[in-house]
Amino acid sequence: MEARELSLRYGPKTAIHKVSLAILDRRVTALIGPSGCGKSTFLRSLNRMNDLISGTTHSGTILLDGTDIHDRGVDVVDLRRRVGMVFQKSNPFPKSIFENVAYGLRVGGMKDKAELATRVEKSLRGAALWDEVKDRLDESALGLSGGQQQRLCIARAMAVEPEVLLMDEPASALDPIATAKIEELIHELKSTYTIAIVTHNMQQAARVSDRTAFFYMGELVECGPTEQIFTNPREKRTEDYVTGKFG
């Protein structure tokens, strides 16, 4: 997946300006930068979530398997199936654990009970949650802990078999133990999925990502291998940010 010269405006305000960035297959790309720098706006652009905000306009292109996701013929619902999203705050539906994961499958037309059960189990196993919930699938998802709810949301995104997973600060509201489980899960998921993650946590970016992109004031300042970004960045602004001189 790749953005080329992508700019996005909310009304008259430019949120990101001419960003060109490739999200490499089966790698984790971390998007870092101070609050308001455009990293979450960029992330939401990758599956057109910004379309839901009134007054949003864009220029440039975003390619998924060589096709511009803004082409007239693109089915936005299918795009969001192919490019799944996990939000900062876990958002389980007020349904059972099983129905949370099955929701997207049912919307997509899957009706066979055995097939649904197989896909739900596969997704919960993939999200490292199955062993914790297998005996209470009919219970409300709202009864899960915060960390479990976030992994449930990851399972729900995985159930429809996306190609790309977008994560907007998925562990920011979690305690250290739950955060460690999410980070371990991200390591496991990258063998199957292309992942882009927004994080304010520099240590987390260093731990989970293969590549890191630094945004500042709506522009992409620098992108490269994570180790290089944190130990030998090319740009002084990047160095100042990762060493804590501003944030």
Curated annotation (Swiss-Prot):
A Pfam family annotated for this UniProt entry: ABC_tran
Keyword Iron in record: no
EC assignment: the record states 7.3.2.1
Q: Which GO terms describe its cellular component?
A: plasma membrane
Could you tell me where this protein is found in the cell? Cell inner membrane
Domain named ABC transporter: residues = 1-242
Name the chemical reaction catalysed here. phosphate(out) + ATP + H2O = ADP + 2 phosphate(in) + H(+)
**Where on this chain does ATP bind?**
33-40
Source superkingdom:
Bacteria
- Give the record's subunit note: The complex is composed of two ATP-binding proteins (PstB), two transmembrane proteins (PstC and PstA) and a solute-binding protein (PstS).
Known NCBIfam families for this protein?
Answer: 3a0107s01c2 (TIGR00972)
Protein family per UniProt:
Belongs to the ABC transporter superfamily. Phosphate importer (TC 3.A.1.7) family.
Q: Say what the protein does.
A: Part of the ABC transporter complex PstSACB involved in phosphate import. Responsible for energy coupling to the transport system.
**Protein known as:** Phosphate import ATP-binding protein PstB
Q: Which organism is it from?
A: Myxococcus xanthus (strain DK1622)
